[in-house]
Amino acid sequence: MMLHAQNMPGQSGMPWLVFLHGFSGDCREWQPVGEQFHTCSRLYIDLPGHGGSAAIPVGGFADVFQLLRATLISYNILKFWLVGYSLGGRVAMMAACQGIPGLCGLVVEGGHPGLQNEQARAERRLSDGRWAERFRREPLSTVFHDWYQQSVFTSLTAQQRQALTALRSQNNGETLAAMLEATSLAAQPDLREALNALTFPFYYLCGERDSKFRALAQEVAATCHVIRNAGHNAHRENPAGVVDSLAQILRL
């Protein structure tokens, strides 16, 4: 089994750019940024529970990792960079730490390296369980209205919140809930030690108004790019700034 994806061909011999979206996004999320790098082949993946992969069930990160590997193999992708936002960033970090073949470098935007104690994991498990129950039972427009009131999204304007709520409400609540539980931050190991031992390039992007993830970026051995005029979702709030950072990273 493989994940649904959109494939945009580039020049042969260049490493692929493989983009992983955040929770409740889909393969379109990274395209305004990724399509600025037309010399590279690009693969925009729908993670399980999302978009064209909505019907693919997973029990945890191990299943997501195997699906990601199978998808890369199906496209004969032998050299690539992983670029992931939030949930996609966590999946990318997990894959990098497990040693996915062919990985040339890692770019993470606003991805959490992992909780560091059992109390924090228990609290997060409870919180994610409550959100999952709401995704299953309530209209998505209601749930996402509240979702975007969370502190990590304080930089969003009312208009941006409204637009994101309308966009994300096109998802399937049941499959979102299942993916949220399967890939909860509570189920993710603390990756700091493994990330700090990586031998290939590792870059971290965060919005200048995202104080939580700017602090987390200092806890991993990554080169940090701070995106001006942006909060947690930097590639949506300032796509040109993220394009500039990626161009520096990829030297394109």
UniProtKB/Swiss-Prot annotation:
Single Gene Ontology MF annotation: 2-succinyl-6-hydroxy-2,4-cyclohexadiene-1-carboxylate synthase activity
Top-level lineage group: Bacteria
Known function: Catalyzes a proton abstraction reaction that results in 2,5-elimination of pyruvate from 2-succinyl-5-enolpyruvyl-6-hydroxy-3-cyclohexene-1-carboxylate (SEPHCHC) and the formation of 2-succinyl-6-hydroxy-2,4-cyclohexadiene-1-carboxylate (SHCHC).
Annotated organism of origin: Salmonella arizonae (strain ATCC BAA-731 / CDC346-86 / RSK2980)
PANTHER family listed in its UniProt record: 2-SUCCINYL-5-ENOLPYRUVYL-6-HYDROXY-3-CYCLOHEXENE-1-CARBOXYLATE SYNTHASE (PTHR42916), PROTEIN PHYLLO, CHLOROPLASTIC (PTHR42916:SF1)
Alphabetized HAMAP family for the sequence: MenH (MF_01660)
Family, similarity comment: Belongs to the AB hydrolase superfamily. MenH family.
Keyword annotations of the record: Lyase, Menaquinone biosynthesis
InterPro entries for this protein: AB_hydrolase_1, AB_hydrolase_fold, SHCHC_synthase_MenH
Pathway: Quinol/quinone metabolism; 1,4-dihydroxy-2-naphthoate biosynthesis; 1,4-dihydroxy-2-naphthoate from chorismate: step 3/7; Quinol/quinone metabolism; menaquinone biosynthesis
NCBIfam families: menH_SHCHC, PRK11126.1
Gene Ontology biological process terms from the UniProt entry: menaquinone biosynthetic process
EC number: 4.2.99.20
Protein name: 2-succinyl-6-hydroxy-2,4-cyclohexadiene-1-carboxylate synthase
Pfam families with a match to the protein in the record: Abhydrolase_6
SUPFAM superfamilies per the UniProt record, alphabetical: alpha/beta-Hydrolases
Enzyme class: lyase
